Amino acid sequence: MLSPVPVDAVELAEVPDVMPDAMPDDQLMLAYAGGDTGAFDVLYARHEGALFRFVRRLLGIRLAAEVDEVFQETWVRIITARDSFSPQGAAWRTWAFTIAHNLAMDRLRASGRQMVVHVHDDDDEGLDAVQRVSGRLLNGQGQPVDAAHPSAEDAAFWRSAGRRLLACLNELPDDQRAAFLLHHEDGFTVEAMAAALDVGFETVRSRLRYGLKKLRGCMARYLSVLVEGA
């Protein structure tokens, strides 16, 4: 498993005299390592939502009760590893998501895939998920989700489709689910994923291909409605 690689010393780059909100992630992390706690606040605000969503969907239904703990542990690891971060390695976002991925996968392996009683039943969560990936699931056929001004009928359909998508994601093997989320929800390239997860390029492509195929099969009833209505 890949973990942040310590370095003997990190020379803190000079940070341009710009507002923290406009600084790239790597510079913010270097500034934080140099003692600027405000830089960490910007990093947290910028990536809190995406990291939490990734951890929540990767852990899935059976470990929903452990999402907050893994999410908080991710940030603790980021804080404690601040002096080992090097901008010559992976970009900060890739580095941070790798930490979250490794912690979540450790928790999944330790769980033995046993179902946890606590279950999220969040229509907004499902709707958000299906909005993000509907275009990829349709593969150019039909019309992706546009929930800007849905009718009551459309809203009900998409909430139902969203709940189904979350259930389908939960049925994927852990490595395929992680690859799908990183690539299709969070925008990581195959090359970045291979480097971050310390696996081969073709391995990542295979996980994506098989995961997407399974999701399309699992979502077939909903996807057929979209294709027919296009």
Task: List each language-model region with its residue ranges.
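Structural recognition of an alpha-helix C-terminal capping motif at a helix-to-coil junction
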Residues: E69-V76, A90-N102
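Conserved RNAP core-binding helix
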Residues: Y44-A45, F52, L63-A81, D186
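Amphipathic alpha-helical segments enriched in hydrophobic/aromatic and basic residues
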Residues: M29, F40-Y44, F54, F71, ...
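Hydrophobic-face residues of short alpha-helical interaction/recognition segments
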Residues: L51, V55, R82, A96, ...
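Intrinsic, short, N-terminal disordered tails of RNA polymerase sigma-factor systems
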Residues: M1-G34, V42-R46, G112-L182, F188-E202, ...
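Sigma70-family region 2
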Residues: A33-G34, R57-R62, E73-A90, A110-S111
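Residue-level signal for the short linker/turn that defines the boundary of a DNA-recognition helix
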Residues: G38, A90, G187-F188
